Amino acid sequence: PNTVGGSVVNRFCGSSMDAVHQISSRIETGDIEMGIAVGIEDMFSVPMGGFNPDFHPELAEQEYYIGMGETAEILAREGSISRDEQEEFAIKSHEKALDAWENGRFDDEVIPTDIYGEYIIDKDEGPRVPDIEKIKSLSPAFMENGTITAATSSPVSIGASAILITSRTYAEKNSIQIKATIKGRSIVGVDWRRMGMGPLPACLLYTSDAADE
């Protein structure tokens, strides 16, 4: 109904996760009994080269203006993760995703979307059968002597997901199947050049096994 409130959350890559944090926190305090967290990604709306923010010389001197691919190269170098290891991981990821689609593991999670009555999107277009020779032939995408290529990077994507979060009492009262339980939440900052490591320190607050996993 029109009386239901909503808000927009911006924490870049972690925006939808932050929405989950906010809803679960409000459920714990008793403000609400349930809420829906929605995440939307529309990389096609971002112009080539980004939105051209105002250039600041002092920030440039401190290397603030680096791309996500460059931060990934830093982590790969520090972790001694070779190109071969990255490509092997990428190939296995595609193979697992394709196997899951073929065996209907996502059927209950995907909502078919009708596009102007012309065609229906009901499957992720990202996974593909890996062409190992082509993968090996690709040039580094972000640094001249880097190890990361287009094959081991995320594709340009458009998509959305949603999750219903309720209190246990509300779920049981309304016969809602409980598929997961939120045990805790945390937000932590890291050096911007290592932004890909962001979630790990927060995970370590709850379990000593997170680093090994």
Task: Describe each region flagged by the PLM.
Residues 28-79:
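Flexible glycine-/small-residue-enriched beta->alpha junction loops
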Residues 5-10, 35-41, 85-92, 110-115, ...:
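Beta-strand segments within the central parallel beta-sheet cores of soluble alpha/beta enzyme folds
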Residues 11-40, 76-106, 162-169:
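Active-site-proximal alpha-helical scaffold in enzymes
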Residues 172-205:
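Glycine- and Gly-Pro-enriched alpha-helical subdomains that act as flexible
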Residues 1, 52-74, 119-136, 195:
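Active-site-proximal gating segment of KS-fold condensing enzymes and close homologs
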Residues 1-32, 63-70, 132-155:
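Conserved catalytic cysteine-centered active-site region
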Residues 85-173, 178:
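N-terminal extracellular/periplasmic Venus flytrap/periplasmic-binding protein-like
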Residues 206-213:
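Conserved small/polar residues in nucleotide/adenosyl-binding loops
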